[in-house]
Structure formats: structure tokens, C-alpha cells
From Swiss-Prot:
Enzyme class: hydrolase
EC number, as in UniProt: 3.4.25.2
UniProt subunit comment: A double ring-shaped homohexamer of HslV is capped on each side by a ring-shaped HslU homohexamer. The assembly of the HslU/HslV complex is dependent on binding of ATP.
Gene from which this protein is expressed: hslV
Name of the protein in question: ATP-dependent protease subunit HslV
InterPro entries reported for this sequence: ATP-dep_Prtase_HsIV_su, Ntn_hydrolases_N, Proteasome_sua/b, Proteasome_suB-type
Transmembrane annotation, as ranges: none
HAMAP family, per database record: HslV
Active site: 14
Family: Belongs to the peptidase T1B family. HslV subfamily.
Entry-linked SUPFAM superfamilies: N-terminal nucleophile aminohydrolases (Ntn hydrolases)
Keyword Cytoplasm part of the UniProt annotation: yes
Amino acid sequence: MAQTDDRLPQMHATTILMVRKGGRVVIGGDGQVSLGQTIVKGNARKVRRLAKGTVIGGFAGATADAFTLFERLEAKLEQYPGQLTRACVELTKDWRTDRYLRRLEAMMLVADKEVSLLLSGAGDVLEPETGVMAIGSGGNYALSAARALEDGELDAEAIVRRSMKIAAEICVYTNGNLVIETLDAA
């Protein structure tokens, strides 16, 4: 169990999946929030729109930390409009150098119509080699399922829905209450 200090268990665990295919990018996330071995909420919203709907993102990790990072990313997107990669690089610089921010425990997947990125507290800003990326405790299950489905006839949203269902059947920290956001890609 992840902990923020020696006494308090951290709210953690989720699955976030991003698929870019056929002119669309889709991010889906489950709704479960766990505290230790207990489910405390089943319908959390871990996927949302940013920058007046031009960017979608999802987070895994400590909820309050992720909301702080979403707010900071929103500010960077206002500072660098239409430049998702630049905004993310500037956010991760702050994340790594600011005393308060560097203690935040979260990962994010974000996308606009042109680029998909993973942001981590280690200072990573990574673009996937393929159109599929996942984070969280069920991320590897969702990623494997999505990769198996991506060459078939399913569209991006259907791949996200089926892959997240598979992850929820395997990962005890992931449920089937999905939030899905979609953007038309370039």
C-alpha cells in the first residue's frame, strides 16, 4: 500500500487509458478511489477537459495532487496557448524544482488534436511510439488489451471501453464506472 508518510495510507490506484486512432483521441478512466484496501468512492471523475475543451487529460495517483497538477497545467496552457508540449515541459520543470510541487504523487496523460503525452513526477514528458498509452494500477492490463485491439475494426472509443472493461475485471483497484472524453484529432 502506498503511503504519504508512516501513518496515513494514501488514496491511490486507478486506470487511465489513451487511444489515438482514426482521426480521434480518446481518454478513459475508471471511477474507483481506494484508501488502503477499502473502496471509498466508486464514481470519481479522473478524466476531464482543459483549455476550453481543446485538451483532454486523465490522472492516476493522489487525487488532491492530481487536481493541483491539472490547475497548474491549465495555467501553463493559458501561458502557452495551442502549445501542449511546451506547456507540459514547463509544468514538469516546475514540478521538479518547486519544493511543494515535487512532493506531489501523480501521473497524467494529456492530449490535444495533434499530440499525446505522459507526464510524471520524475520529470518525464513522453510521447508514445504508438497511439496507445496507459497509467495506473490497471494500466498494463488496459494497455495490453488496447494494443491487441488497435489493429482491428474497432474505433478509438470502442477500444478504450473494451480495454477498460478488461482492466476492471483484473485489477482490484479499477472499476467499470468509466468517464470517457474524446477529441477529433488532426
